[in-house]
Amino acid sequence: LRSALSWAVAEELLRSNPLAGVRGPARPQPRRHHALAEVRQLLGYAEQEVERASAFLVGERASPRRLRSLFSAEQDLLLVRLAADSGARRGELAVLRLGDLDGRVLSIERGLSHGVLGSTKSSRARRVTLGATTVALIHHQFDSWAEPRPTPMGDWLFAPTPARETFMTADALSHKFRRLGRSAGVENPALHRLRHGVATHLVEKGKLLKAQARLGHRDPSTTLRHYSHAVPLDDLDVADELDQVLNDR
């Protein structure tokens, strides 16, 4: 539009360019994400914490404090694994239930916004396929706590206690992740950066539409606007193909 108006002024079709001095919208800054090495560092540390908490229960009566420590460590591990696998928003992670998982397919239908349970940010449900390791971890954590209880156990994936009677808030998950990240030695840990890592990885692989679907964006333009920095520039194969077509006379 700016170029067209400048041309009109040059051709004396307009006296002046109405957009002169008007600045266009700022280009979104690249979303900061946790690199794959950092994610692996987080997973490794979380796994060690689960092993350490489990070791304290061997050979002694399990005290409530020891059990809470083990449950918290397991929740840390699941949080990193599921967030890095699904690309879900923190408000979506907070209200996931075991019943949302069908085989390896996770249905993301709910979200928390300012502490209020409702639909997802895009108001659209979506389904994502999880890695087999993530699914096995979810079932293991539920099965290991499913001993006879006075009351039935709830099915929230992230909960304050092993009873799983209520979900954790999105802020609580963010705090939990930040504390874990600092303990693991990760610089500036933030839960939403795992989501950005999923998007960046997929866009770098040329899978823009799959990134859009996994993140729950309404359209690909949203994904491209925020992650255009990750679009691969390796188009050598395209150049070679066009070169062959042009030379094939």
Residue ranges of model-derived segments:
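C-terminal catalytic core of tyrosine-transesterase DNA break-rejoin enzymes
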Residues: 72, 81, 85-92, 172, ...
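Non-catalytic DNA-binding core/recognition domains of DNA-processing enzymes
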Residues: 1-8, 22, 130
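Basic, Lys/Arg- and aromatic-enriched nucleic-acid-binding interface segment
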Residues: 10, 14-16, 20-94, 133-134, ...
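Conserved tyrosine-mediated DNA breakage-rejoining catalytic core shared by Y-recombinases
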Residues: 20-24, 30-33, 86, 95-144, ...
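C-terminal secondary-structure termini that scaffold catalytic or DNA-interacting sites
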Residues: 44-69, 115-127, 132-134, 140-152, ...
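Short, polar N-cap/turn motifs at the start of nucleic acid-interacting alpha helices
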Residues: 99-105, 188, 207-228
